[in-house]
UniProtKB/Swiss-Prot annotation:
Lineage: Eukaryota, Metazoa, Ecdysozoa, Arthropoda, Hexapoda
Record carries keyword Secreted: yes
Domain of life, source organism: Eukaryota
Family: Belongs to the apidaecin family.
One GO BP annotation of this record: innate immune response
Protein's UniProt name: Apidaecin 1+
Annotated region described as Disordered, given as residue ranges: 1-20
Record's keyword terms, sorted: Antibiotic, Antimicrobial, Immunity, Innate immunity, Secreted
Known function: Antimicrobial peptide active against many Gram-negative enterobacterial and plant-associated bacterial species. Not active against other bacterial species like H.pylori, P.mirabilis, B.pertussis or N.gonorrhoeae.
Inducers of expression: By bacterial infection.
């Protein structure tokens, strides 16, 4: 069997930065 390729970490949504 083919070795499983390590999938990249899932992209997490950035927390909304406070608008100054």
């Amino acid at each position: 069997g083919k070795p499983n390729r390590p999938r990249p970490a899932p992209i997490q949504p950035r927390p909304p930065h406070p608008r100054l």
